[in-house]
């Protein structure tokens, strides 16, 4: 995908496959607002200016298990820096579905700890604009986060809202988020909800 028209076509394709706007946003590594804009522009329903966002394509990493393992190993190394600085350790690695899970699996293996999976609320949005009322959930097929020190892993931070709701869920269940690690950070914050953020790449706009 090289331009906005390619993005619109891909967004339409994903919608036709049954994905909701929150899921489309994850697939294209854009904000939910940008995904909605792409879909409404495709239907000629908006003349609004595009949201300020950056499209990320890391599929050359994601489709290769060896590359994925190498990248996740780098993320584990970044996490180690935070844990040493805080003089703490980790009980469970939390992968944010979908793209954060394979990365988190490698990081959990590196540390010899359990893997938890959290499904963001936006994945259960009905596209009525009420997605913020939907709460994230911890998958019952993986480890729980109750009373545990957690490291959160995802591929991209865009607005940070998914991270914020993930941290809140962990805290509500008596756990503690001690670090966040991502491949790409588009938000540019050193912390989210007072949890340190580590990134392999940080992207900033010059407007």
From Swiss-Prot:
Cited InterPro entries: GfcR-like (IPR022854), PRibTrfase_dom (IPR000836), PRTase-like (IPR029057)
Classification of source organism: Archaea, Methanobacteriati, Methanobacteriota, Stenosarchaea group, Methanomicrobia
What family, per the record?
Belongs to the purine/pyrimidine phosphoribosyltransferase family. GfcR subfamily.
As given in the record, the signal peptide range reads none
Q: Which UniProt keywords apply?
A: DNA-binding, Transcription, Transcription regulation
The record ties this protein, via NCBIfam families, to:
PRK02277.1
Source superkingdom: Archaea
Q: Per its record, how is this protein called by name?
A: Transcriptional regulator GfcR
Q: Name one GO biological process term.
A: pyrimidine nucleobase biosynthetic process
Gene name of this polypeptide: gfcR
Q: What is known of its domains?
A: Contains an N-terminal DNA-binding winged helix-turn-helix domain and a C-terminal regulatory domain (or effector binding domain) resembling phosphoribosyltransferase (PRT) domain.
Q: Extract the CDD domains matched here.
A: PRTases_typeI
GO MF annotations in UniProt: DNA binding; orotate phosphoribosyltransferase activity
Entry keyword annotation includes DNA-binding: yes
Q: Which SUPFAM superfamilies match?
A: PRTase-like
């Amino acid at each position: 995908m090289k331009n906005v028209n390619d993005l619109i076509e891909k967004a339409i394709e994903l919608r036709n496959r049954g994905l909701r706007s929150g899921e489309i946003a994850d697939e294209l590594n854009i904000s939910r607002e940008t995904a909605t804009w792409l879909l409404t522009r495709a239907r000629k329903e908006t003349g609004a200016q595009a949201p300020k966002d950056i499209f990320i394509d890391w599929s050359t990493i994601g489709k290769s298990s060896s590359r994925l393992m190498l990248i996740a190993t780098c993320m584990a190394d970044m996490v180690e820096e935070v844990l040493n600085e805080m003089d703490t350790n980790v009980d469970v690695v939390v992968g944010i579905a979908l793209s954060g899970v394979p990365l988190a699996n490698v990081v959990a293996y590196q540390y010899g700890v359990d893997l938890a999976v959290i499904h963001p609320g936006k994945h259960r949005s009905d596209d009525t604009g009420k997605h913020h009322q939907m709460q994230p959930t911890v998958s019952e097929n993986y480890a729980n986060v109750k009373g545990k020190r957690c490291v959160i892993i995802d591929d991209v931070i865009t607005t940070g809202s998914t991270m914020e709701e993930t941290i809140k869920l962990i805290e509500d269940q008596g756990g503690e988020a001690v670090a966040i690690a991502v491949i790409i950070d588009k938000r540019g914050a050193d912390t989210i909800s007072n949890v340190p953020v580590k990134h392999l790449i940080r992207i900033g706009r010059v407007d």
